[in-house]
């Protein structure tokens, strides 16, 4: 069911806000080391300012402690709190009867060159001031202390920047004021742990039509994992495919023990030139605990510190995924990983995502942009950071993982070149997608 608020900003600008479920069917079962799903229920936000419609989406995987913290009901709870904040702020504004309005929604980003134009006073331009107003209500929402607020803020912020970009006829990466990198970044397609090898091969066939950069999900079963990698390679060779594998990312989804990591190291090191990274081999609990009174196991932590060096010595890089939510997590991760996978739902959106990327680079960590299982709306938003600030590209394949019938948007913010590299579409405004007719 759609929930909605309508109001008049400064008695001049019509604004409509709404939230609804965005149900997605997957092309193949999407399996990781901790879950298998065939459908997803994401949240879709729409913010309409006069005749300009901005859209935002947050991907909502099955909940997992310390990592995936929100479901649709949580997003709806947050949305209701946000519109309550808007209602209260509106009443204050009416009492004060101030004509001008200004709020710097980007003041937490220390480098002032980012979002430079959107920080300014709008001098009576109410159609832009309303976005500043909605950002202020978002930043002051009483639910921001809740762990599920990050995914909620991500979707709302996305819709705000989509609408603002459409109004200014600019794509988001130009709003951010980041140039498109001269070196194009790779697009990875995820081959998940489907229930059967036939489904894994079907996924391989589908993904390899788009890119030679493949992300393969594995669990703690080393023999099975290496069989999957071997089978994927043979599949492309035996099909006489014109596509060769450029790079493979191995994603353990926090499922390995130190012993398993060392067994995989033996098997993966001979193909180190092919492996771009190993994602999240260690448990999330290596650096975090569900119970705040519980202490970190220092011996366990030190073992993973050693494994980082062992992998490095064999030419393999370890990246964090589940363990990195916001920039606050970065300092502790430096000892464990060579890089981090940044996802907008976990950071809280593009603004904190940008801050997290910048801090990661300051700490000497490599960067990668990931996405949840989501439509092209969501992954296109992430592409605006990937195009310039990701060292290793990313797995922006969410739009390919879902079937066409449940995809509400078209015309991605980026195009895939024949070699699997991403090129931004500079003529697509806002996030860069359009609603299907």
Curated annotation (Swiss-Prot):
GO terms for biological process: peptide metabolic process. The keyword Disulfide bond does not apply. It comes from Dictyostelium discoideum. GO terms for molecular function: metal ion binding; racemase and epimerase activity. This is Enolase superfamily member DDB_G0284701. Belongs to the mandelate racemase/muconate lactonizing enzyme family. Keywords: Isomerase, Manganese, Metal-binding. The keyword Isomerase applies.
